[in-house]
């Protein structure tokens, strides 16, 4: 699975994530430059991550140095934050993202969560007063306008359930290209993957290794005994087994490491396949969602429970 391996729609199958705890512009810029040198071409960011500007700086520097021939050789994904998930704020939000990136377009623009907040509310913790009802139709019509204006080559969503996708598809004139969600061997998303495949929506996996080390992540994936046993028997790392498994599901995936050796390891999962028996063993791993999105739930807000946020799909 090289970094240049792409879906039928031209999206690289593997991308580098840039969500970090607190702004770290220079380390991000250096890491993205190093990743480009290693071979990554897809970079995943978001307004909420505050990493758009250093990614743009790294991309411009890579073009100047000849590491890539032009910006067109890179695939940039960014996301609409909840406080801009309002009809009249979507296009301006993307224009601000493009200013941050110093680019004329993004390759993919996603609705970050099916959640709306009052304009200006950016950082957790959130209160019930921060949330307002999510007008999916209005937000999506504005996303479609982003595409028509040429500001986003493709549009999609993140953290959408089957039910929410069904609702979106009932009125969308431009269907979502991608649904970016948590996918890993501990949260395999079989139902959602089957639904998306049937609707022509590409599933993109975030936290394929369980997001160990983040404020919401877990050791459950990397510490899974089945994965450790498969890795040992195949002479691979647990990370490589996880990424190979996601890849063999047909999903795109977003991995995050600023360490060059790990960057290379995360790309080095070609030349072997998991056996049917290994797939069977992985399928039997007890399932539990890691990123529950609890911060978007409030007894006085639009989503009063996790069941409502995920439409029972947890």
Curated annotation (Swiss-Prot):
Role: Catalyzes the reduction of a 3''-keto intermediate during the biosynthesis of 2'-deoxymugineic acid (DMA) from L-Met. Involved in the formation of phytosiderophores (MAs) belonging to the mugineic acid family and required to acquire iron.
Activity-pH dependence: Optimum pH is 8-9.
Biological process according to GO: response to iron ion starvation; siderophore biosynthetic process
Listed name of the protein: Deoxymugineic acid synthase 1-A
Catalytic activity: 2'-deoxymugineate + NAD(+) = 3''-deamino-3''-oxonicotianamine + NADH + H(+); 2'-deoxymugineate + NADP(+) = 3''-deamino-3''-oxonicotianamine + NADPH + H(+)
EC number, as in UniProt: 1.1.1.285
Tissue specificity annotation: Mostly expressed in root tissues, observed in mesocotyl and embryonic roots, seedling roots, crown and seedling leafes, mature bracts, anthers, pistil, caryopsis and embryos.
Region annotated Disordered, chain positions: 1-21
Annotated binding of substrate, by residue: 112
PANTHER family: ALDO/KETO REDUCTASE (PTHR11732)
Signal peptide limits: none
Gene from which the chain derives: DMAS1-A
Protein's pathway: Siderophore biosynthesis
Record key words, sorted: Iron, NADP, Oxidoreductase
SUPFAM superfamilies: NAD(P)-linked oxidoreductase
Enzyme's top EC category: oxidoreductase
GO cellular component terms, semicolon-separated: cytosol
An annotated Gene Ontology molecular function: aldose reductase (NADPH) activity
Residues binding NADP(+): 44, 158-159, 180, 258-266, 273-281
Active-site residue numbers: 49 (proton donor)
Protein family membership: Belongs to the aldo/keto reductase family.
Induction annotation: Up-regulated under iron-deficient conditions in root and shoot tissues.
């Amino acid at each position: 699975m090289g970094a240049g391996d792409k879906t039928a729609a031209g999206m690289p199958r593997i991308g580098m994530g840039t969500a970090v705890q607190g702004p770290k512009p220079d380390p991000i810029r250096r890491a993205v430059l190093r990743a480009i040198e290693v071979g990554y071409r897809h970079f995943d960011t978001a307004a909420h991550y505050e990493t758009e500007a250093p990614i743009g700086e790294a991309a411009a520097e890579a073009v100047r140095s000849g590491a890539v021939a032009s910006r067109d050789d890179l695939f940039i994904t960014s996301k609409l934050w909840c406080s801009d998930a309002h009809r009249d704020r979507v296009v301006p939000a993307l224009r601000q993202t493009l200013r941050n990136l110093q680019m004329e377009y993004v390759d993919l623009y996603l609705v970050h969560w099916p959640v709306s907040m009052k304009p200006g509310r950016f950082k957790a913790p959130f209160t019930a007063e921060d949330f307002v009802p999510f007008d999916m139709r209005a937000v999506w019509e504005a996303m479609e306008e982003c595409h028509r204006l040429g500001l986003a080559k493709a549009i999609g969503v993140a953290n959408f359930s089957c039910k929410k996708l069904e609702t979106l598809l009932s009125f969308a004139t431009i269907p979502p290209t991608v649904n970016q969600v948590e996918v890993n061997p501990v949260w395999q998303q079989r139902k959602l993957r089957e639904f998306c495949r049937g609707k022509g929506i590409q599933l993109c996996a975030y936290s394929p290794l369980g997001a160990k080390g983040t404020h919401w992540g877990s050791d459950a994936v990397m510490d899974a005994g089945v994965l450790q046993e498969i890795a040992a028997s195949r002479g691979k790392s647990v990370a490589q087994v996880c990424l190979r498994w996601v890849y063999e599901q047909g999903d795109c995936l977003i991995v995050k490491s600023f360490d060059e050796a790990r960057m290379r390891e995360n790309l080095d999962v070609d030349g072997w396949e998991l056996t049917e028996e290994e797939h069977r063993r992985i399928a039997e791993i007890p399932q539990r969602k890691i990123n529950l999105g609890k911060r978007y739930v409030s007894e006085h807000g639009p989503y009063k429970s996790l069941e409502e946020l995920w439409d029972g799909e947890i």
